Amino acid sequence: LLFGKNGRYLDYAAGYGIFVRLMRDIGFDFFWDDKYTQNLFSSGFEWDQNSDIDAITLFEVFEHFGDPINEIKNLLKISDTLIFSTDLHPNPLPKPKDWWYYGLDHGQHIAFYSRKTFELIAKKFDLNYYGITPSFHILSKKNIAPYKLKITRLSKIGLHKIIYTLLQSKTESDHYLITKKSL
């Protein structure tokens, strides 16, 4: 809804590739990239670094950045739109034992953000910041019309089911592409 189904998208730090596969199955041209994980579900749709990308998705990635500003700078060389999830820290900042998102059991969450943090990052890179929910965000050069943001929030009442009927799966065409490559 916010970005066209005819665009090209990259799922960064995509893990095993399940999100890429699911998005391709409903008709979006998504590609996989992850330097730490094997692509199991979207093999054949690895990102070609010479291809244009309209937007990058990053789910549960920002909190792992050791140097967020540099990471964002590098991502913006690929696309001027980042669609991502990360929980905003509560205000006041909770003690470690009082907020599950610190991830003390695994120690992998090392960067935490507030709405103000993302507003400052947006300003630094001349982007717009859209806080869709407290855990879903967009940083983009594009101006997103306020009505589109409101419609996006309607997914809570089932709007996504209507949109889903308008999409065409890439499952069959991907099967052909994959099997043709393996001949």
Where are the language model's segments positioned?
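Conserved SAM-binding loop
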Residues: 1-97, 107-125, 134-141
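Rossmann-like AdoMet/SAM-dependent catalytic core
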Residues: 115-183
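Short glycine-enriched loop/turn motifs at secondary-structure junctions
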Residues: 102-105
